[in-house]
Amino acid sequence: MTEYSKEEIAIMKGEVCPYCGSKPELIDSAEIYNGTSYGKMFICRPCNAYVSCHVGSETPKGRLANAELRQLKIEAHEVFDIIWQQKYKRGRYQAYYWLSKQLQRPFDFTHIGMMDEESCRRTITLCKQYLYKKDPDKFPQYIDG
């Protein structure tokens, strides 16, 4: 099982920019989304890395992400969410538990919002392989993971 340093945990929790090490700034998401507010966010302006906060709070959903990581998180959620939403696992909690075992990460740090690029890529591959194995007729596009 992977163990994390205090610095790595601070990055995964959105307290430190993973690209430059600076402390991110709390803003309203309207600044990013052309005037439409979806709540609070943390941003590192020099790196153009940001993360949204849990609804109604100032708690980041995970690590700050640049454009590449934001896209990988979207792709990881697209394939991972199928696993729990279509009941291939009993629920979201069980799906994350399965993923934590596959990635050999502590459960508390197995959330797509906390992942870096490598972990997102591994999640995408693992989930595609799992779905293809469970239902190859429904997921033929995932034959290669």
Which residues are covered by each model-predicted region?
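Chromatin/DNA-recognition segments of nuclear transcriptional regulators
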Residues: 109-129
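N-terminal cysteine/histidine-rich coordination modules
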Residues: 1-58
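Intrinsically disordered or highly flexible coil/loop and linker segments, enriched in small
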Residues: 85, 89, 108, 133-137
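Short, well-structured alpha-helical interface segments that form or flank functional binding sites
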Residues: 12, 39, 71, 94, ...
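Short, surface-exposed acidic
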Residues: 90-97, 101-115
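Long C-terminal interaction/binding lobes of large macromolecular proteins
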Residues: 130-145
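Extended interfacial segments that mediate partner engagement and assembly in macromolecular machines
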Residues: 57-98
